[in-house]
Amino acid sequence: MPTLPFSKWSPGGNTTLLFPSNGLAPALQCRLARQALTESCLGGEQAGFVNIEARSLRMAGGEFCINASRAVGALLACADDCRQQTDDMSRPHENCVLSVESAHSPLPDAPDGPALRRSYEISVSGWQSPVRLRVRGYAPYWRVEAILQLPDITIQREAEGIHLVRLPGISHLLLDRHIHSQPEDCFAAAALLRERYDLKQEAAVGVIWWRTLQGQMDMLPLVHVRDTRSDFLESACGSGALALALSRAQTAGAKSFSIMQPSGSPLDVRLFSEGGVSMAGVDGPVSLVAKGQVWLPDMTD
């Protein structure tokens, strides 16, 4: 039975599976992701397909994802470190993390001295401009900031304490928990909210319950991806943190936010201008959890 190489990452707790794209059609990517994300298989909250040589990431549902983008930054850094330590710069990047041969290969050793700082640029599904990745650290722990050029973004006040932020590739409905308490059944509540605000046909929708408590913002994101037919109460959500920061910046005028995620790890969001262009950075930890091969029934189709 054919196998598919994988790596499993934790960008701020948002468990992410990355696979090599290998020319896999989008419909097959969706099916493979649905199988791999189940608890009986690899488990995870989202999946993406990477072409490292082309520096591209396509999420399984074609949505946009900041945390998966940050995981790719760590993957690229790990691949570069592997190639440097083997003294063979001609080897393709995939041979380190996303190949069958890499399943039993060790991770690169962390050299003495200060952590390396590296920068990459990738294309990501759903987002029109390249995403810059600023990577610090060594395997298996890094900090990665995704730096985005912001297009015109619509922020609508739908009701008291409810705002809809439409980002390219994903929309987020933000509910202030001081007004709208967190429901007992978040999945049912999110489904009703998507229907109420006519979001059922969006590629991806996050429903986020947020609050500020003793000066600390925190959020609980539930993300629905249409094409993979998935609903996950996520441990962290980078695009949701960005949407919340943009909404609060419009209301309160702040430009820097530290937003606690359900994992207990914050994501740091900064809004700034670069050459007159509106930009955003989303920064946080990324760790490599596992790498190897997985047997998926649809690989034989």
Each model region followed by its residue ranges:
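Surface-exposed beta-loop interaction hotspot
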Residues: 146-186
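A glycine-rich beta-to-alpha transition motif near the start of alpha/beta enzyme domains, typified by
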Residues: 1-142, 173-301
